[in-house]
């Protein structure tokens, strides 16, 4: 996993350093903070303003951040995210400012998913940038899956999501 954000503009590096500081202050159980997604791949969109069919639209990439803790945050997760975001936006003037998006995972569940070859976590490990590590834990090795395992993961994912969709449609 990469550890440098030096390829990003100074303003983005400042934002990420500030987010790391805020996260570490808000979440004492934090063992790793990982940037993933478009900013980690250096394929982000800073601000794309378009006018299509008479409507002005804006698109901006967000900071995708995986917060790894000893135990999942559980029910307080969204309250913590709201506090972090609120503190991050203090003294920021522009309405078009890069927003952080968070997910939380326990180190044990993250490592289990890496060992199982779960694609989402594999991609985070492959393309992500370690912004902070307590050095208490190491990430597990990603395992290559055979076709049967890939097919089973796809079936399980479909079953879970299809059930949610069915429940939603049926009320």
Roles of regions detected by a PLM:
Residues 66:
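Short aromatic/hydrophobic contact patches that present stacked aromatics
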Residues 1-34, 39-59, 69-171:
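Catalytic core of pol beta-like nucleotidyltransferases
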């Amino acid at each position: 996993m990469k550890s440098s954000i030096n390829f990003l503009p100074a303003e983005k590096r400042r934002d990420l350093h500030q987010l790391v500081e805020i996260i570490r202050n808000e979440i004492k159980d934090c063992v790793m903070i990982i940037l993933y997604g478009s900013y980690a791949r250096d394929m982000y969109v800073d601000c794309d303003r378009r006018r299509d069919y008479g409507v002005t639209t804006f698109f901006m990439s967000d900071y995708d951040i995986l917060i790894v803790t000893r135990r999942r945050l559980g029910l307080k997760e969204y309250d913590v995210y709201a506090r972090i975001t609120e503190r991050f936006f203090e003294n920021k003037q522009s309405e078009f400012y890069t927003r952080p998006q968070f997910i939380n995972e326990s180190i044990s569940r993250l490592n289990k998913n890496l060992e199982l070859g779960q694609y989402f976590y594999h991609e985070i490990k492959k393309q992500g940038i370690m912004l902070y590590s307590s050095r208490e834990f190491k990430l597990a090795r990603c395992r290559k899956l055979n076709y049967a395992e890939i097919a089973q993961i796809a079936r399980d994912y479909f079953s879970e999501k299809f059930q949610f969709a069915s429940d939603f449609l049926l009320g």
